[in-house]
Curated annotation (Swiss-Prot):
UniProt entry tagged with the keyword Transmembrane: yes
Protein's gene: vha-2
Listed name of the protein: V-type proton ATPase 16 kDa proteolipid subunit c 3
Keywords linked to the UniProt accession: Hydrogen ion transport, Ion transport, Membrane, Necrosis, Transmembrane, Transmembrane helix, Transport
Role according to the record: Proton-conducting pore forming subunit of the V0 complex of vacuolar(H+)-ATPase (V-ATPase), a multisubunit enzyme composed of a peripheral complex (V1) that hydrolyzes ATP and a membrane integral complex (V0) that translocates protons. V-ATPase is responsible for acidifying and maintaining the pH of intracellular compartments and in some cell types, is targeted to the plasma membrane, where it is responsible for acidifying the extracellular environment. Involved in necrotic cell death.
Pfam families the UniProt entry points to: ATP-synt_C
Side Lumenal, residues: 1-15, 80-98, 159-161
An annotated GO cellular component: membrane
């Protein structure tokens, strides 16, 4: 029986960190998406009392918040596909890289969801009183959405390298 030093030093708990990365990507982006959806929906509901004709036009922040959750789903599925057992060669370096990828995507999505919720709420209420604010609201929402997209791009680079 021979002793293989590389196999002996491979941590059996390395896949745990990979799966934690996949889970954190999904959990944190969905938390951000839920907050953005709820906060924007509160603004839409209070605006709909005064100007019900603007409700469909004001759904954009809710849609953009939902897209943040999809970013986390994509990264979680990519990371889940990369995690193997420790005996198949999955080491701590890969586990920590996948954890970093998941946290990057998740926390960027959480921040983007918060930003979309706050901007969506204030923007929808403001648009009800001054329709010219709509374009500015959309631009700020796009910049907020891009924060989550940046996190997904970095996570995919970290997760596949």
């Amino acid at each position: 029986m021979s002793y293989d030093l590389e196999t002996a030093e491979r941590a059996a708990y390395a896949p745990f960190f990979g799966y934690m990365g996949a889970a954190s990507a999904q959990i944190f982006t969905v938390l951000g998406a839920a907050y953005g959806t709820a906060k924007s929906a509160v603004g839409i509901c209070s605006m709909g009392v005064m100007r019900p004709e603007l409700i469909m036009k004001s759904v954009i922040p809710v849609i953009m918040a939902g897209i943040i959750g999809i970013y986390g789903l994509v990264v979680a599925m990519v990371l889940k596909g990369k995690v193997t057992s420790a005996s198949a060669g999955y080491d701590l370096n890969k586990g920590f890289a996948h954890l970093a990828a998941g946290l990057t995507c998740g926390l960027c999505g959480l921040g983007a969801g918060y930003a979309i919720g706050i901007v969506g709420d204030a923007g929808v209420r403001g648009t009800a009183q001054q329709p010219r604010l709509f374009v500015g609201m959309i631009l700020i929402l796009i910049f907020s959405e891009v924060l989550g997209l940046y996190g997904m791009i970095v996570a995919l680079i970290l997760g596949t390298s």
